């Protein structure tokens, strides 16, 4: 029930120098290498969601995000690969014509800008626009923010099975990822539970919503996976709020320092919205613990360019 959009398996890399510096063993699942234009975690979810869109005979795909949304860019890209029309509902903000937004435009995506207030009721806006387009003969498939629903979560359920074949997952003390819309941590948690491993999944919240919101959402996503034939026992995950910094998509000075350090010491590029914050959180939580920790690099390199003034 998916189509193959990405380059898998992505490698797992041990960060020797940073592990020595911070006193625990840091391994990175390099999902920044899933593709080029489609790079990052979103394409794993889109393998399932685009499969369903094509199965239902869609001609047009709706999704949403910020102006520099990695998910919106990846959705536009895979839609064009399969001859579908991408319509991106993007939350208004500082418009910098580079990075993801530039790629959206090059891919010929139709962009509908919505205010932050309108974005809070994005499902209603989707419904209005969907009805208008379907009256004109289009068939619309709606993908939620981040591709984070029960079907999309199978992308990271499958990633767990992939990692099981790459390394001894049971030897890890934690798996860490950024949390932006909840689908990645849901899939990881479901996969670990399915394998009956006792490895906690720790999500570092980078949004303005609190951890209670995401705990509830992740549980609903995992519960909904039963509709597709997956039944799992109790999942072990947590979402922490302590490393969000000044706000969503606004890196703190500590985030910027971590981003630069990982680049200059290990040659890995993080992004200022998700992975730099999550990596900093991981370091603070596990410093000098001598534990084995697996970090999921969810990509986001194109988001660097719109924030160049904050980074140099």
From Swiss-Prot:
Modified residues (N6-(pyridoxal phosphate)lysine): 42
Keywords: Hydrolase, Pyridoxal phosphate
Gene Ontology molecular-function annotations: 1-aminocyclopropane-1-carboxylate deaminase activity; D-cysteine desulfhydrase activity
Presence of keyword Hydrolase: yes
Reactions performed catalytically: 1-aminocyclopropane-1-carboxylate + H2O = 2-oxobutanoate + NH4(+)
Stored CDD domains: ACCD (cd06449)
Cofactor: pyridoxal 5'-phosphate
Source organism superkingdom: Bacteria
Gene3D superfamilies given in the database record: 3.40.50.1100
Pfam families to which the protein is assigned, alphabetical: PALP
EC number: 3.5.99.7
InterPro entries: ACCD_DCysDesulf (IPR027278), D-Cys_desShydrase (IPR005966), TrpB-like_PALP (IPR001926), TrpB-like_PALP_sf (IPR036052)
PANTHER family per record: 1-AMINOCYCLOPROPANE-1-CARBOXYLATE DEAMINASE-RELATED
Family: Belongs to the ACC deaminase/D-cysteine desulfhydrase family.
Protein name: Putative 1-aminocyclopropane-1-carboxylate deaminase
Species of the source: Thermotoga maritima (strain ATCC 43589 / DSM 3109 / JCM 10099 / NBRC 100826 / MSB8)
């Amino acid at each position: 029930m998916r189509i193959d959009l990405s380059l898998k398996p992505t490698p797992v890399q041990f960060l020797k120098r940073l592990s020595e510096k911070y006193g625990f063993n840091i391994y990175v699942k390099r999902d920044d290498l899933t593709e080029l234009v489609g790079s990052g975690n979103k394409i794993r979810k889109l393998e399932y969601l685009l499969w369903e869109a094509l199965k239902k005979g869609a001609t047009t795909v709706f999704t949403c995000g910020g102006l520099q949304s990695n998910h919106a860019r990846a959705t536009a890209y895979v839609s064009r690969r399969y001859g579908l029309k991408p319509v991106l509902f993007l939350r208004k903000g500082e418009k910098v014509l580079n990075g993801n937004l530039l790629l959206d435009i090059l891919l010929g995506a139709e962009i509908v800008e919505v205010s932050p207030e309108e974005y809070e009721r994005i499902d209603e806006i989707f419904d209005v626009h969907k009805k208008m387009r379907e009256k004109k003969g289009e068939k619309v498939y709606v993908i939620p923010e981040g591709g984070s629903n029960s079907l999309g979560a199978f992308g990271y359920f499958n990633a767990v099975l992939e990692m099981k074949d790459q390394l001894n997952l049971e030897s890890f003390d934690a798996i860490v990822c950024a949390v932006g819309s909840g689908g990645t941590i849901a899939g990881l948690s479901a996969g670990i539970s399915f394998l009956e491993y006792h490895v906690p999944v720790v999500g570092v919240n980078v949004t303005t919503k609190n951890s209670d919101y995401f705990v509830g959402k992740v549980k609903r996503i995992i519960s909904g996976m039963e509709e597709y034939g997956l039944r799992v026992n109790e999942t072990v995950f947590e979402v922490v709020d302590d490393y969000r910094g000044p706000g969503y998509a606004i890196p703190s000075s500590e985030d910027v320092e971590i981003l630069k350090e990982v680049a200059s010491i290990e040659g890995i590029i993080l992004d200022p919205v998700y992975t730099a914050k999550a990596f900093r959180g991981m370091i603070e939580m596990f410093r000098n613990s001598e534990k084995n920790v697996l970090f999921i690099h969810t990509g986001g390199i194109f988001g660097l360019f719109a924030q160049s003034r904050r980074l140099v």
